Amino acid sequence: SASRKMRIFSSVVCRLPFIVWVPFYRPQTDAASGSILGGHLTSNLAGSFARHGKRTLLIDCDLRRPMMHRHFKQQNTTGLITWFENGANVEGNLPEDPTLGIIQVGEGLSLLCSGGRSKSPTEILESKAFADLLSRLKRFYDLVVVDSPPLGAVTDSLLIAQRTDEVIYVCRFNRAYKKHIRLYVKALRSGCNEVLGIVLNGLTPRRIEYYSDYRYYRSYKKYYGSQS
C-alpha cells in the first residue's frame, strides 16, 4: 500500500548532509525503464526527507535521459546544462540564480532540473565547477538528493558518486545478479566516501516472510555459499 511504502522510505531518513541515489542496471534490461524506475524512487525519497522537516533539494543529474521534470510536471528549459553553458557561477544566492532555475515543487522540497539533454555530459560531471556547485548548495539545504543514470549503463553515476558524501545503491528484487552487485558496489566504494547501504526494491511482505523462514535460509545459504 501507499502508506506502507512511505513508512519504508521514512525509515531511510537519517542525518546525512548529502546523498546520491543509484538505481540498479541490468544489461539485459532496457536502460530507459531502469531510469524511470530510479526516478520514482528518488523523488519518493526526496519527498520523504521534506516531510520530515528537512529542506531538501532534488537534482536531476541524468543528463542523457532526464525524467525528474516529468515527475513534477515542470519544464526542463533551465538547469545544470544551462548553468554550465552560462559560465557555471557558484557565487551568490544559488536558489535564486536564473541560470540554475531551481523550482519549489512542494513544502520544503525544491528541484534542480537537468536543463535539457547532453550526449556527452562527462565534461560537466567531472568538472571542478560541478563539484563546487554541489559543495555550495549544501549551505542552502539540509539534504541534497541526486538522481543519477542507471549504474552500469554509463560511467556518469561513478563520476557523480565521487562528488558525494553517501551512496544508496538500489537493486530490484529478482532482477539483479549477485556478481554484478558485488562489482558495482566495489566500484562505488573505490570512487566515493561511503556506500551507506543497498536497498532491495520490489520485495513484497509475502516474499519477505518466505525468505525469513529458517529452512529456506539454510537452503539459500547452502546454494549461494558456494558462489561466494
Regions found by a protein language model. Name each.
Residues 1-228:
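P-loop NTP-binding module
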